[in-house]
Amino acid sequence: MQMMQRNVVGQRPVAGSRRSLVVANVAEVTRPAVSTNGKHRTGVPEGTPIVTPQDLPSRPRRNRRSESFRASVREVNVSPANFILPIFIHEESNQNVPIASMPGINRLAYGKNVIDYVAEPRSYGVNQVVVFPKTPDHLKTQTAEEAFNKNGLSQRTIRLLKDSFPDLEVYTDVALDPYNSDGHDGIVSDAGVILNDETIEYLCRQAVSQAEAGADVVSPSDMMDGRVGAIRRALDREGFTNVSIMSYTAKYASAYYGPFRDALASAPKPGQAHRRIPPNKKTYQMDPANYREAIREAKADEAEGADIMMVKPGMPYLDVVRLLRETSPLPVAVYHVSGEYAMLKAAAERGWLNEKDAVLEAMTCFRRAGGDLILTYYGIEASKWLAGEK
């Protein structure tokens, strides 16, 4: 039997032995940062090992070596042209009203305040807004007829914006919850059922009234079955063939909507003794656990005439954004919702993250996942950051 060679401290292992190879390899990566003349290498910390360069044909870091080169090979870019700015409107006073759960966001007083607010982001390239009116309680009813009042707050705001900025793209919200005393997107029966087809009749009237006011894009967010096709037919019947539909295709029953409902006082209102008002919107909005269901919704919306499909919320549902991007040729919108905005604001206010970097990273992720349009309350700030402002 061959005797094992004893490793003596300071003695070089026998050439060709397994141990000689191991020791040699270890030596390659553990020698201190000293050159052959005994002097330390310059430009690296003392103690940095001297190694034999790896024989790598591909080194991905070469394409990350400088900001200029990184920019030249960047796969997606974010532009203010991608942003749609949500605006909340009220007329309870002539003053803007801060929304406590959305720092930096106000309910804008109808009139000059709205014009002034929209003018600023336009100067940075944000030329799309979506209008959300806060309806006074005395105008809310169980059947939400205020939704299609031709002189309602939403309709007047659309006219105001189009008169002031003819080239502004004005999107609207098509749903009954801002006008419904029960706080739901559809009409609620006494038994607590959201009436699908009856609701659609009023959604069609709402969409037509918005188109008559000058809306460029109507956006059904209600999640009633068949509403896109019905709205398309209603618009075409009234001569609005050029008005687009951005469907909330995959709108999830999410916990991230809380601040938005604060802004419009539009949360469900259960607890009535004689009526079973659902405490949430889970019978019509999608289950957060579901992925394949989004394909079914997308196929239906595309077949019914949607021009744009939306995923809401955004960051927790990037897989669904990618799914729609890969299964449909239609533009995909992503809603960076109020809860996502509030979380970023809260963390930034406490110094837990760099707000600018985090927001622009989020916008980039929406684009990388396949989003063409981004509805975001950061529209003004992000456009300024993209322009180089601090």
Curated annotation (Swiss-Prot):
Annotated residues for binding of Mg(2+): E297
Active site as annotated: K251 (schiff-base intermediate with substrate), K312 (schiff-base intermediate with substrate)
Binding site for 5-aminolevulinate 1: R261, K281
UniProt KW S-adenosyl-L-methionine keyword: no
Protein's cellular compartments: Plastid, Chloroplast
Pathways per UniProt: Porphyrin-containing compound metabolism; protoporphyrin-IX biosynthesis; coproporphyrinogen-III from 5-aminolevulinate: step 1/4
A GO cellular-component term linked to this record: chloroplast
Chemical reaction(s) catalysed: 2 5-aminolevulinate = porphobilinogen + 2 H2O + H(+)
Any GO BP annotation: chlorophyll biosynthetic process
Cofactor note: Binds 2 magnesium ions per monomer. The first magnesium ion is required for catalysis. The second functions as allosteric activator.
E.C. number: 4.2.1.24
Cofactor section: Mg(2+)
Transmembrane portions of the chain: none
Key words, A-Z: Allosteric enzyme, Chlorophyll biosynthesis, Chloroplast, Heme biosynthesis, Lyase, Magnesium, Metal-binding, Plastid, Porphyrin biosynthesis, Transit peptide
Positions contributing to 5-aminolevulinate 2 binding: S338, Y377
Transit peptide range per the UniProt entry: 1-24
Main location, first listed in the record: plastid
Primary enzyme class: lyase
Gene Ontology molecular function terms on file: metal ion binding; porphobilinogen synthase activity
Region span, Disordered: 34-69
Quaternary state and interactors: Homooctamer.
Cited NCBIfam families: PRK09283.1
Function: Catalyzes an early step in the biosynthesis of tetrapyrroles. Binds two molecules of 5-aminolevulinate per subunit, each at a distinct site, and catalyzes their condensation to form porphobilinogen.
Family of this protein: Belongs to the ALAD family.
Name of the molecule in the record: Delta-aminolevulinic acid dehydratase, chloroplastic
Species this chain originates from: Chlamydomonas reinhardtii
Encoding gene, per UniProt annotation: HEMB
